[in-house]
């Protein structure tokens, strides 16, 4: 096949080539492109941080620290966003009024109101107590409102006047009123409901004055403790005090043990699903279990709790000592009568009490009967003598006095012990805080074995807590044995149970059951703030949505620009390489064809 070709030689001035791209130019273009992209990325990060920093999770432990510090400061009564609430605790020996406050709800339906106790200008808690108890008005119920007037006047002076009409008042009566006949209870409450609104502008209705049961009081105490400890917070946080969480992000709540002078109380959360029980135990469980929702929306179950609560009258430290002395007196006198002995009838032949320090002498009197006792400090024998007072049954699911007890998962639980649980471990033994059974038993046994003269000398030398007195020294041996038996034999706590903490204060303050009461009573108040927040969010939702979309669009544009710069640099590189490969043959062809025409000899 023949090949036809055409050739046309142009003047040298007509020839041109693509200019070579220097490395310096490429570096300059790349530097400018990267600088431009870096500026855009930095601008995007600044905008992103300023827009979303408010919603980023903060250090919850640091926030809680700030909240605790803030609770010790005087309440700013000039703040119009603060709300107030009053709770009157009408007890058996007196009545106290507590003033609480809280800011506007944060708009998160998962959070409760942030209720705190009000503090005056001197940063002291706003609380006032009067005596006697309101039950003293049983025969003159028409004076019940006069009885409470000093408390309400005190509260009215601390709550801003413009807030009175929206400040709820709750009058909750406990042990003293429970002992009165229902007719007298209703007469006292009726006088309060009728007369108090005539003098005070607080938000108060008939349902806000009531006599609460021991079960309700226990539930309120459980709510208050767990609220202060932050156990109702459902965020995922690294708090060393409570890192274990339950299903659906719920944190593990703590149980409470509270031993007073006359009664003993236990309260703890139980699973919603329990094993099938016999009919008799099932009925007992229903009486002792309380299920409630602390959330503001009944449709949401994240704040639904099921709590076992029981109060044991006569199982407090002082009352248990009286029961023990009655037991010793009766058994000793009966034994003397049967065996013809005279133990305890004179100081020379006393009854040797294992629950008193060595050498301590005392006299037990009941009516006309007298028993002389002297301590022998045998803690193990003391525990054995106290076992019958627990009145346990043979069933494994029964605790003190044969009362049904819901199972406790001791491998996944935590308890706080208050009142006598703290006094027994701290006032004399100085081991309050984290409880360890064997350590406590050793310290209690050593104390009981000491001579009374040695103990009194140590007390004079200030070796015990400042709260300790002669009464504590005298009955510490007995109360430590009683506490130990109640905890391990009565409630079946393992002897090496590691998650019990004895305490008097929580974060430096005493937590009253009234805090739990107002938390429960005001649980629906956040609905108002939530509705207002919903309206505000509806107006701003379009802007937030458009901002998010523009945010991602801006980021995509940066990527496109970056890709274009890279492709442009690659294109320049290919052009340069192609130009370099073609330059040598082109120059040679030009020399071979053009130079001979000029009469120049090329080659040898």
Swiss-Prot record:
Main location: membrane
Entry annotated with the keyword Hydrolase: yes
Residues annotated as glycosylated: 330
Membrane topology: Multi-pass membrane protein
Origin superkingdom: Eukaryota
Co-factor requirement: Ca(2+); Mg(2+)
Family: Belongs to the GDA1/CD39 NTPase family.
GO cellular component, as recorded: cytoplasmic vesicle membrane; Golgi apparatus
Vesicular topological domain: 50-546
The species this protein was found in: Pongo abelii
Classification via Gene3D superfamilies: 3.30.420.40, Exopolyphosphatase. Domain 2
Protein name: Ectonucleoside triphosphate diphosphohydrolase 7
Tagged with keyword Ligase: no
Catalytic activity reported: a ribonucleoside 5'-triphosphate + H2O = a ribonucleoside 5'-diphosphate + phosphate + H(+); UTP + H2O = UDP + phosphate + H(+); GTP + H2O = GDP + phosphate + H(+); CTP + H2O = CDP + phosphate + H(+)
Compartmental location: Cytoplasmic vesicle membrane
